[in-house]
Structure formats: structure tokens, C-alpha cells
Amino acid sequence: MFKLNDEKGRLKCSFCGKTQEQVKKLVAGPGVYICDECIELCNEIIEEELNDDSDMGFSEIPKPQEIYEILNDYIIGQEEAKKALSVAVYNHYKRVNNEAKKKDDVEIQKSNILLLGPTGVGKTLLAQTLAKILNVPFAMADATSLTEAGYVGEDVENILLKLIQSADYDVEKAEKGIVYIDEIDKVARKTDNPSITRDVSGEGVQQALLRILEGTKASVPPQGGRKHPHQEFIQIDTTNILFICGGAFDGIDKIIQNRIGKKGLGFGAEVQSAKDEGIGEILSKVLPQDLLKFGLIPEFVGRIPVISSLDALDEDALVRILVEPKNALVKQYQKLFEIDGVELEMQEDALRAIAREAIERNTGARGLRAIVEEHLNDIMYDLPSMDDVNKCIITEEVIEKDERPMLVKDNQGEKKHESA
């Protein structure tokens, strides 16, 4: 058994054997002593192991095809956008690994991503799902709330605070996260002509975003809000943070059509009406010069080299979104009904009626939940108090004419139509 003191009665460290005179401090435990030097050594060993673990987080980056397949489980359609994002994200985290190893002098520059498409087509969901696949912190910001530093509104650094909070204030983890900035088209320059009035929510925000998009050591106020000289800041390096910007870019289709139209002049040119092409097909032809004409500044466009467009969702796509993904809306409501002991059946014509209503409202997939909730609210109010019902059938009439659903009762085993 290890002795706690030497022949002269002096206390000594149970690990390295140094006496109390040879070290600064001895910490006592039940039948054991440890010196400050051994504590420091233990801390270094633990820190090394933690660093190794954090490096291992990206040692097995999913390949583009694997990322694509996982995205397919959650997102219907948008094949080209999913492919482009899978490659871009794979290359980004390969670059992060390469930077960590620093085996050569070749510096791979970061490729941030721009997603174009109408509202409700899956831009936000794509970014969220990517962060989930890679198990990295994720933060979302709305570009419309941002203003240039010194003006009323949010500073761009507050975006980074959301990411740090998502990483439970682990800055090192946050530095490998993903940030999605929505409605980036709303910070386009209001006019091509310079004005006496400062554009603090347009070009000013683009200028403020440049630094964090490219990579900088940013000072973030830990409580958010505006900076002031006497507060402490969290320092975060944005070099390895992947920024995904999204926007509807209303009107850019006309800019693209004007550019393409000029090439269709002359004898023998193929004449094609702009009306023959859908919005998704037009957006797929976007070039950086179109973004410049729309109002993004050249430096900003240069920081987002990966540009991908998303298609508007038609009736068939919306029906698939209702039933096919792992967390599909219909599956969620079936689970809610199942908890009350009731089977929920949504007929095909009812699903198509929901999809048509979403198209009429111009809300895309984002509006599907509100429509379903609106039409199922009354029956979800009544069912918990109806002990004899085991099945609820939603028909087209329930959606289009606000009729009551068809209920199957335990004691009769046949369909009964409930009148209002």
C-alpha cells in the first residue's frame, strides 16, 4: 500500500511521490493526496483527448450520395438543389478537415451557398436537415431584421450569437456550424443610382455581412443587442462556418428572361416564349450578373459562389410532401389521433384538395400544416370525448365544403356520416 508520508513524516503526492515541500499544493482525498503538477498533467491529457474527439467529428464526412439519400428522406423533389448542396457541404467539411491538418500550403477557399426559390419550397428545411445530418450547430436569421452597425435593428454579429447559443456556448463547436440567412433578397440595393440617403438595411447590411461570410474573428456581445465599449465579447472565427443564404428574389426571373431573350434574336434563332418556361426552369439559368442587376453588390456575390435554384411545388409534389417524408404531416396527425385510440385516414382526394388550397394561398409546403389544422380543428375538439369512435375518415368534402368527417364507431363497425 502506498504511504501518504515519507520517513520524516512529510506528506507526499500519491501519484508522483513528490513531498509537500517540492510542490505548490497538495489536495487531500479519502486516503490519497494529489499535487498541483499532477492535476495540471491530468488536465492536459483530458484536453488532448477532447481535442482528438472534436477532430474525429469530421473524420467520417458523409459522401455526397449519402447526404443526398438522407435529404431524400425528408425533402420531396428539388433533385438538382439537393445534389448541389450535397457536393457543396461535402467539399466544405473536407476543407475544414484539411485546414485542421495543414499538411501543405494550398489554402482552399470557402464556398458559401445561395438558394433561390419561391416561398415554401424547402429552402429552410434543406439547411436544417444538412445541419442535422452532420450533427453541427445550426442557427437561422432573417435578413430583414438586420441593419448596418449604429442604426436601429440587429447587428450582423447577433447571427453568430444564435449559433453560439445553439452550440451551448461551445465556441469551438460553433466555429464548425451552419448559418441560414433567410430573405437575403430583401437586402438588395433599392436602386442602381447612389443616393444621398444611406441604405442602412440594404447595401449597408451586405457590406456588414461580407466580413463574416468570408472569414474573420468577430466580437460577439454575449447578451446580444448593441455593442458598447465597456462590455466583454465572445471571440469567434467564422472561417469554417458555412453560410447558406436563401430568398425568393421576386422579379429576378424577368432579369434572366431579358438576358436570355437577347440571344434569341436573328434569323434561324429558336423562338421560345417566356411563358413556356416555369419559374423554376428560369431560375435555374441564373448567373452572377443577374444577381448584380437585382441589387446584390459584386463583393457579396463573390462570397457566395454556389448558386442553386428550387422549383415551385405543384399539386403532385405537395401531395407527396403530405405523406412521404419520414416526418410527413399526415403521419404526425395520424400519431396524434392514435394517442386518442382513433385511426385517421386521409383519402387521396382530400390530400389533393389540401394541396390545391396551398397553391391558391401561395404558401407552398409551409402553409400545409395551417390548412390541415384549420379543417381538423373541430373534430380534434370532439374526438377525445367520444369513446365509441375508432376511425376518422377525411374526404374531399371535409376540406372543400367544411363537412364533418366520416366516423366509424366500435359498436356498429360501419361508416356513419356525422352531420354538423
Swiss-Prot record:
Entries under Gene3D superfamilies matching the protein: 1.10.8.60, ClpX chaperone, C4-type zinc finger domain (6.20.220.10), P-loop containing nucleotide triphosphate hydrolases (3.40.50.300)
PROSITE patterns: CLPX_ZB
GO MF annotation list: ATP binding; ATP hydrolysis activity; ATP-dependent protein folding chaperone; protein dimerization activity; unfolded protein binding; zinc ion binding
GO cellular component, as recorded: HslUV protease complex
Residue ranges annotated for the ClpX-type ZB domain, each copy included: 1-54
Residues the entry annotates as binding Zn(2+): C13, C16, C35, C38
Binding site for ATP: P118, T119, G120, V121, G122, K123, T124, L125
An annotated GO BP: cell division
Keywords, sorted A to Z: ATP-binding, Chaperone, Metal-binding, Nucleotide-binding, Zinc
Complex formation: Component of the ClpX-ClpP complex. Forms a hexameric ring that, in the presence of ATP, binds to fourteen ClpP subunits assembled into a disk-like structure with a central cavity, resembling the structure of eukaryotic proteasomes.
Homology family: Belongs to the ClpX chaperone family.
Classification via PANTHER family: ATP-DEPENDENT CLP PROTEASE ATP-BINDING SUBUNIT CLPX-LIKE, MITOCHONDRIAL, ATP-DEPENDENT CLP PROTEASE ATP-BINDING SUBUNIT CLPX-LIKE, MITOCHONDRIAL-RELATED
Function: ATP-dependent specificity component of the Clp protease. It directs the protease to specific substrates. Can perform chaperone functions in the absence of ClpP.
Protein name: ATP-dependent Clp protease ATP-binding subunit ClpX
